[in-house]
Amino acid sequence: MSRLGLFGYGSLVLHESASMTLGRPAGELRPVRLHDWRRRFSQRRDNLTCEKTFECAEGWRPEWILGLNVEQGEDEAGPVNGVVIELTEAELDRLDVREVRYDRVDVTGSVRGEDLPQRIVTYTAKPFHFAPEPPEDAVILRTYAEAVETGFEALGPGELEHFRATTPYPVERVEAALVIDKIPSGNPRAW
């Protein structure tokens, strides 16, 4: 039986986040590189109408929340760093529920690392949710940015620095609380 892996490049790099969605300990998260792609905050979520709405302390609800995305085309700063998480087809179905604004794509030939699964997939923003330029009133949730950076720091020396060097923050990071929760089981509620 061939092994299946997920290339995680954002919040799934955080062990706790991956484990929550998989419904089991995620196991070893092995650092790898995704070549011929770049990472950006280019996935947008309509904060006012989606399954989770966040509100800032002042009562302001930003219209758009940005999340990380990978796009084809490598940056001068180098390939996208991330992790490979081994999983089953059933677990991949759970990830599809979590990654509702993303399409699953095969990146097997673009991932470099040791002892890789025979098939590796990742998620890239669906056309409707892809924002090459941040919409007006877009923000990044501070809890999301901190979770991602915590995950990369835990991977070991140089991983957080590489993330920061290859991933610009295009808009403000804000503190916000979840005020509307229609989130499917296994999905993070902090972002």
Locations of regions flagged by a protein language model:
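A glycine-rich, hydrophobic/aromatic-adjacent loop/helix-cap motif
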Residues: M1-W191
